[in-house]
């Protein structure tokens, strides 16, 4: 199976993640930071979606019945818990090896996720639309951020939500997300990130608005070294997440 192509696909990035595809679910491996980050982004999506739809975020399946596409799903580290919250999840990734890993893990776990080796461009071109569109830790890895975000926004139904998480382009993010995380602490494989591809909140907001959505929230995420945990915060100098809405028709 060959990897799909498209204007947002950076072949070098796809190849980099394919090389470590077998480690997606190894919580002590190259993806360990993502696993520690997962509770924060999962809660952010759940809580915002529940506020938007008037649901109880602490209910057994708070996202029940909502369609969701996880763009750049990798091995399914976020897709699976979103499906456990009741969402009807479609996971997209341009790396076929990632999709094979994701499918195998979901089948073993008994979690229903529709994984596809596709791009968001092909899904939008086919006319599919979703209640929730998720692009977490993706926009800093695509070839054309603005084009990618506009296409992702096109997948949002009227009244739906778009979520993104990425890294701000600041000197602090260079020091922490690249020098610290990749070279000093070894949390991530060297070369995982390119500082010049980091995205400021203002740049991301402009791309979202050009796609017809309105930014509803921007929240920072900070790491606490003593506890080893991440939490939502006002500080957006390094990691941050956004929620955007498409007005109801």
From Swiss-Prot:
What are the record keywords, sorted?
Answer: Methyltransferase, S-adenosyl-L-methionine, Transferase, Ubiquinone biosynthesis
E.C. designation(s)? 2.1.1.222, 2.1.1.64
Please list the reactions this protein catalyses. a 3-demethylubiquinol + S-adenosyl-L-methionine = a ubiquinol + S-adenosyl-L-homocysteine + H(+); a 3-(all-trans-polyprenyl)benzene-1,2-diol + S-adenosyl-L-methionine = a 2-methoxy-6-(all-trans-polyprenyl)phenol + S-adenosyl-L-homocysteine + H(+)
Q: Keyword Transferase on this protein?
A: yes
Judging by the UniProt lineage, the source's domain of life is: Bacteria
Q: Where does the signal peptide begin and end?
A: none
What class does this enzyme belong to in the EC scheme? transferase
Q: Biological process GO terms, please?
A: methylation
Binding-site residues for S-adenosyl-L-methionine, renumbered to this chain: 41, 72, 93, 136
Pathway given in the UniProt record:
Cofactor biosynthesis; ubiquinone biosynthesis
Any GO MF annotation of the entry: polyprenyldihydroxybenzoate methyltransferase activity
The text of the family note is: Belongs to the methyltransferase superfamily. UbiG/COQ3 family.
Q: What does the record give as the function of this protein?
A: O-methyltransferase that catalyzes the 2 O-methylation steps in the ubiquinone biosynthetic pathway.
What's the protein called, per UniProt?
A: Ubiquinone biosynthesis O-methyltransferase
Q: Which organism is it from?
A: Methylobacterium sp. (strain 4-46)
């Amino acid at each position: 199976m060959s990897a799909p192509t498209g204007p947002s696909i950076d072949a070098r990035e796809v190849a980099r993640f394919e090389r470590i595809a077998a480690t997606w679910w190894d919580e002590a491996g190259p993806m360990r930071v993502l696993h520690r980050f997962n509770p924060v982004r999962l809660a952010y999506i759940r809580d915002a979606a529940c506020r938007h739809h008037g649901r109880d975020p602490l209910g057994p399946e708070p996202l029940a019945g909502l369609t969701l596409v996880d763009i750049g799903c990798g091995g399914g580290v976020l897709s699976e818990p979103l499906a456990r919250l009741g969402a009807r999840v479609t996971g997209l990734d341009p790396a076929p090896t990632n999709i094979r890993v994701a499918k195998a893990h979901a089948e073993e776990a008994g979690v229903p996720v529709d994984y596809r080796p596709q791009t968001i461009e092909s899904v939008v071109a086919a006319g599919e639309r979703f209640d929730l569109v998720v692009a977490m830790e993706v926009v800093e890895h695509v070839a054309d951020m603005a084009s990618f975000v506009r296409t992702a926004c096109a997948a949002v139904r009227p009244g739906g939500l778009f979520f993104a998480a990425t890294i701000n382009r600041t000197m602090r993010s260079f020091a922490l997300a690249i020098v610290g995380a990749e070279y000093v602490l070894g949390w991530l494989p060297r070369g995982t990130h390119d500082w010049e591809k980091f995205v400021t909140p203002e740049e991301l907001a402009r791309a979202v608005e050009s796609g017809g959505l309105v930014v509803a929230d921007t929240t920072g995420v900070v790491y606490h070294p003593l506890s080893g945990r991440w939490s939502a915060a006002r500080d957006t100098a390094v990691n941050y997440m956004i929620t955007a809405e498409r007005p109801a028709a």
